[in-house]
């Protein structure tokens, strides 16, 4: 009996020791695991599975993706290959292509003819018939989503592509034709655009193509600087300034929708379609 009792005491002691070790480890290890920066990739994989597989219909968007930019992993996806109306998000493709045609510091003359193509009731940046830097016009397209700026950019770039073309509309048509070729060559194969402002009910794109073009543009610091501000002041070639308020209310500290972790990108709406590309940063990750 004495030997059996000692043996039981020994086993109980070993059990108690390991139990104590487990409890102590749990006290320190579990809070460490719960920190967002630890086991991030494993947690992301779990969240991606849970939210992507079990809740695709819980979002009212026609199509969407939530992407980890560090590795291009999708947390959430819904009809990502389905073509949708881009509205003003079309300007992202226009800017990406225009930036390959002319330098940011190019001086662009804005003509009355180009500005007058802006459709009544559409968003404008108050572009005047004067000289602008190209990056001024990019900001005017991105911040207040100025359709007038988009026509000026398309007119200018169309003139570079075809210097002999005489009319504004023809230069814009040349730019748009060349843009659509560029889209196919860059792999934006589900995107087709007919109007540089995005004010077009026949244009099509997908959230995957939008993800690709935004990733391309985010390589440029000038783009990040523009899209991250709730208001933007441009200095024009003549030294004057022009300011715009961002249509993205997530950036506005006075808005109920303000979120300090949102650092871009762009809104777009047309008819009953409301589009949004959001760049969200937390713990140094986008």
List the predicted regions and their residue ranges.
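Active-site-adjacent loops and short helices of periplasmic peptidoglycan-processing enzymes
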Residues: 32-208, 217-221
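Hydrophobic membrane-insertion alpha-helices, especially the h-region
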Residues: 14-29
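N-terminal Lys/Arg-rich, disordered targeting/topogenic segments
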Residues: 1-14
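Domain-terminus/edge residues, biased toward the C-terminal soluble/receptor-binding domains
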Residues: 188-189, 201-209, 214-286
